[in-house]
Every structure is written in C-alpha cells, then in structure tokens.
UniProtKB/Swiss-Prot annotation:
Organism whose genome encodes this protein: Azoarcus sp. (strain BH72)
GO biological process: cytochrome complex assembly
Entries under SUPFAM superfamilies matching the protein: Heme chaperone CcmE
Sequence intervals crossing the membrane: 8-28
Gene name as annotated: ccmE
Alphabetized UniProt keyword annotations: Cell inner membrane, Cell membrane, Cytochrome c-type biogenesis, Heme, Iron, Membrane, Metal-binding, Signal-anchor, Transmembrane, Transmembrane helix
Name assigned to this protein: Cytochrome c-type biogenesis protein CcmE
The organism's taxonomic lineage, starting at the top: Bacteria, Pseudomonadati, Pseudomonadota, Betaproteobacteria, Rhodocyclales
C-alpha cells in the first residue's frame, strides 16, 4: 500500500471516529435536556406529552390534597392565567406551601395530569435558613451587637 493511501485511510478513519463521538455526545445531551414550560404553554399544547419537562408557577391556594396513603400529594400549579393539575409521590420540600413558587419536573399524561417525579420549592431573596434565623433571634435577645 502506498504512503498516500495509508495517509488517506488514517485521515478518513480519524474523521469517522470524530463523527461517531460527536453523535454520541449529541445523543447523550438530548436525552438529558429538560425543557421549562409555563402552565399556559402546557394548557395550549406546546409541551410534549409523555416526555420529561419542567413546569413552574405558583401553588394555587387551597389546592393541596394528600391521598389516604400519606405519600401521594395532588395540587395545582398556576401562572394566574392557566392551571395544571399535578400529582406527586414522595416527600415535599420544607418550603413548599400554597401561594408560593414551585417548579415540578415530570411528564404530562394524555389526561392532562402532570405526574411529577421531582418538586422544587422556590424562595425569595430574603430567605434565611432556620438555624441562622434562630441565631439572629438569640443575638437580639441577649443584645449582642458588633461594635465598630
């Protein structure tokens, strides 16, 4: 085999390997990509049925219901224009409350029910962990202040 043919085969093999690696990376990226939709987009049919995505909004006041099994929770996410019924099986975050922001990840069923596999509670910029709030309260009670 001539040197030129060897070089062409080597370059061709290298390009084929690069294309295969790029295809694998794109495939893995596409499988792990999770889109975010609002309740209005979901209600308008812009969200894929049966595929994993996230919905964010406010937990509608008075919508939280716990099933008899004590593990399944049903609630409604709204963006004040449309509502999406959500069912979730598991323990909810401590910050999850009615009237507060939440993001749920899961799939939309053909019946319009969103089946969440993960619930994330949002908090505002004034959030303080309970331990820090307690320490601050104790400091105020003992009148401990930092002097400059």
């Amino acid at each position: 085999m001539k040197a030129r043919n060897k070089r062409l085969m080597l370059v061709g093999g290298g390009i084929a390997l690069l294309v295969a690696a790029a295809a694998l990376v794109l495939s893995a990226f596409q499988q792990n990509l999770v889109f975010f939709h609002t309740p209005s987009e979901v209600a308008e049919g812009k969200a894929p049925v049966g595929k994993t995505f996230r919905v964010g909004g406010m937990v509608e006041t008075g919508s939280i219901q716990r099933d008899a099994d004590g593990v399944t929770v049903r609630f409604v996410i709204t963006d004040t224009a449309k509502v999406i019924p959500v069912s979730y099986r598991g323990s909810l975050p401590d910050l999850f409350k009615e009237g507060k922001g939440a993001v749920v990840q899961g799939t939309l069923g053909a019946d319009g029910q969103f089946r969440a596999t993960e619930v994330l509670a949002k908090h505002d910029e004034n959030y303080m962990p309970p331990e820090a709030a307690h320490a601050l309260e104790q400091a105020h009670k003992t009148a401990t202040t930092v002097q400059q």
